[in-house]
Structure formats: C-alpha cells, structure tokens
Amino acid sequence: MTRTVFCSYLKKEAPGLAFQLIPGALGKRIFDNISQEAWSEWQKKQTMLINEKKLKLMNAEDRKIIEDAMIGYLFENKEVDIEGYTPEK
C-alpha cells in the first residue's frame, strides 16, 4: 500500500516518497512532509536551475544554492528564479 503524507507544498494528502532521498534532518523533513508529486515538480525546477545558472554539484557553494532554493520552493512557497523562463498559462 502506498504511504501518504500531508504535503506541505500541495497542502493536501498525497502519496509520499518511497524512501528518504537525502540524508540527515532535511531529508527526514522532506520524506515526512513532501509528496511524490511535489518532489517531481521540484526536480524539474532543480534541473532548470542547474542548467540556467551552470551550477556544478561538486562545488559546495553551488550545492548550497540548490539546497536553499529547494527549501524555499518546497516549504516556503518561493518560486525558483530562472532567468528567461516564462511559465505556461
């Protein structure tokens, strides 16, 4: 049976992640409070952010930029700033 969570991003009950994707307290928070649907939406934004800003995941500063954007997007209702991107209406 699928595990459900009250998703902080979607503000509704939804199927949760199958397992904790990120280690530590942040990973636990995501596992407990973010749905699979919201995580998939974040992954799309993350890919766009990495590509647009030419971030390198080996660089600690770039990983911090991604982590801050992820927390803002998933928990604080902040949109990811991606230059040149216009969302579909």
UniProtKB/Swiss-Prot annotation:
Cellular component annotations (GO), alphabetically ordered: cytosol
GO biological process terms held by the UniProt record: cellular response to oxidative stress
Species: Psychromonas ingrahamii (strain DSM 17664 / CCUG 51855 / 37)
Protein function: Could be a mediator in iron transactions between iron acquisition and iron-requiring processes, such as synthesis and/or repair of Fe-S clusters in biosynthetic enzymes.
PANTHER family registered for this protein in UniProt: FE(2+)-TRAFFICKING PROTEIN-RELATED (PTHR36965:SF1)
SUPFAM superfamilies recorded: YggX-like
Pfam family, one: Iron_traffic
Gene Ontology MF term list: iron ion binding
Protein family membership: Belongs to the Fe(2+)-trafficking protein family.
Keyword Iron: yes
Designated name of the protein: Probable Fe(2+)-trafficking protein
Keywords of this entry: Iron
